[in-house]
């Protein structure tokens, strides 16, 4: 699925890219983002080039962690609901803290992606 994402491409450089999001599974929601934000703490430290991954500080000689899909916080409307995701309906407003696109947290997930799975 084609999505758009906020990408940190280098220290202090941000761009907007088209990316490939994974196909939604039965436990997933597809969300059209309306608001997303970059935190001054965690995400700011990645953008400034101070972190390598998760809570690991960058040190001279480490590979740069760029490019990376940033984020872990977003608000949007549900576009589609997986068969094993009870309690949600298309059109619901939701807050989500992650999506299934690899990003700032190694094998965890990123957030500034729309539509987001």
Question: At which residue positions do the language-model features occur?
Answer:
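Extreme N-terminal starter segment of soluble prokaryotic enzymes
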Residues: 2-4
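Residue-level signal for short segments within beta-strands and strand-turn junctions
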Residues: 7-9, 48
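Residue-level recognition of beta-strand termini and adjacent short loop/turns
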Residues: 10-12, 25
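Conserved hydrophobic/aromatic beta-strand scaffold that supports enzyme active sites
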Residues: 16-18, 75-77, 93, 107, ...
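Glycine-rich beta-strand-centered segment in the early N-terminal region that forms part
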Residues: 22-38, 46-101
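A structural motif shared across PLP-dependent enzymes of the aminotransferase-like
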Residues: 99-115
